[in-house]
């Protein structure tokens, strides 16, 4: 078999390019989180980048093999897809560059067509499927009692990761042991790696709990999140900067994530694309964040409109002059 490329959803496994054995399985035996191999089809007019297990991006070519995992994506601004939509042809797409595999069912007109692949088989070992959750080491599920700075958004691409980097950097500069985490969303290692670059001593996301995305049934997510929180707790951080994917109202289980860590959230940042979206979140959840950032705070006019519409403070975190005020707010929230 051609040596395959291992997408970043495989980083929790012991798979390597030299130990991949595949078998084609009947659809009744497929499930979320199964590691599968896809053969890249025509790349003309399609996205062709894959994020490797270490985070490096590569461009694949027609005929290359890629190892990823079956999953679901429900992005409001880019692509929607599900492995359950794969038909008898066995053709599917890379719904993210991290190797989240499924069939695209809806695509933004502003996004190039996702990578097109042909089902080559399930990754097998000792006549059993190799899966994401089956690759996890057993750990003790412990209580979680760590202060959390929670970042939520009105949608994807609302400024959450950029804001998270700023917060991680400020907290680490204060001498705190900071862990970065992404609790919900669709697999992509790049965002968490950027938290590490900003000063986080460790980074985790739902992939570390065996999920290709958090768009799974509620019971599965409620089982996976304590595993993720226990991983974080083992590092004994002073504070966790946690991103809750896109909007809590989207089917990524963001509302459940908020519920399960609610008692530990010391500061909540809402990233919004415009001031009116801030009001939408206030109305939907009947509660307000401590601060607004993202596109809704790009200019003085936007900040003033946020205040007028919602009564909330907003900061343009892309402007370094705002960081002193943010630091003051964080110190107060963490009682430093």
Regions picked out by a protein language model, each given a short descriptive name:
Residues 1-76, 81-91, 97:
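N-terminal accessory targeting/assembly segments
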Residues 40-41, 69-71, 106-108, 153-155, ...:
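Fold-independent oxyanion-binding glycine-rich loops
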Residues 169-215, 283-287, 297-311:
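N-terminal phosphate/diphosphate-binding loop that engages ATP/GTP or pyrophosphate donors
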């Amino acid at each position: 078999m051609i040596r395959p490329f291992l997408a970043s959803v495989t980083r929790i496994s012991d798979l390597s390019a030299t130990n991949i054995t595949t078998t084609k399985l009947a659809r009744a035996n497929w499930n979320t989180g199964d590691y599968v191999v896809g053969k890249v089809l025509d790349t003309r007019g399609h996205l062709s980048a894959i994020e490797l297990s270490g985070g490096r991006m590569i461009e694949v070519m027609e005929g290359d093999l890629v190892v990823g995992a079956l999953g679901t994506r429900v992005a409001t601004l880019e692509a929607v897809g599900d492995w359950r939509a794969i038909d008898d042809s066995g053709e599917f797409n890379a719904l993210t560059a991290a190797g989240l595999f499924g069939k695209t069912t809806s695509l933004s007109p502003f996004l190039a067509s996702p990578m097109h692949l042909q089902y080559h088989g399930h990754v097998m070992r000792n006549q059993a499927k190799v899966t994401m959750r089956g690759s996890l080491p057993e750990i003790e599920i412990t209580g979680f009692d760590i202060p959390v700075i929670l970042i939520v958004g009105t949608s994807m691409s609302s400024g959450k990761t950029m804001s998270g980097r700023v917060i991680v950097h400020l907290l680490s500069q204060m001498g705190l042991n900071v862990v970065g985490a992404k609790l919900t969303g669709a697999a992509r290692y790049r965002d968490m790696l950027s938290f590490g670059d900003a000063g986080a001593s460790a980074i985790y996301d739902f992939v570390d709990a065996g999920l290709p995305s958090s768009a799974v049934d509620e019971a599965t997510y409620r089982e996976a999140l304590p595993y993720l929180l226990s991983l974080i707790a083992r590092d004994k951080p002073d504070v966790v900067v946690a991103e809750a994917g896109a909007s809590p109202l989207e089917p990524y289980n963001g509302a459940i994530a908020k519920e399960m860590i609610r008692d530990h959230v010391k500061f909540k940042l809402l990233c919004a694309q415009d001031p009116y979206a801030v009001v939408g979140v206030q109305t939907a959840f009947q509660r307000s964040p401590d601060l607004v950032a993202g596109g809704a705070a790009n200019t003085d006019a936007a900040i003033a409109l946020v205040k007028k519409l919602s009564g909330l403070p907003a900061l343009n975190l892309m402007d370094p002059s705002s960081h002193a005020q943010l630091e003051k707010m964080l110190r107060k929230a963490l009682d430093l």
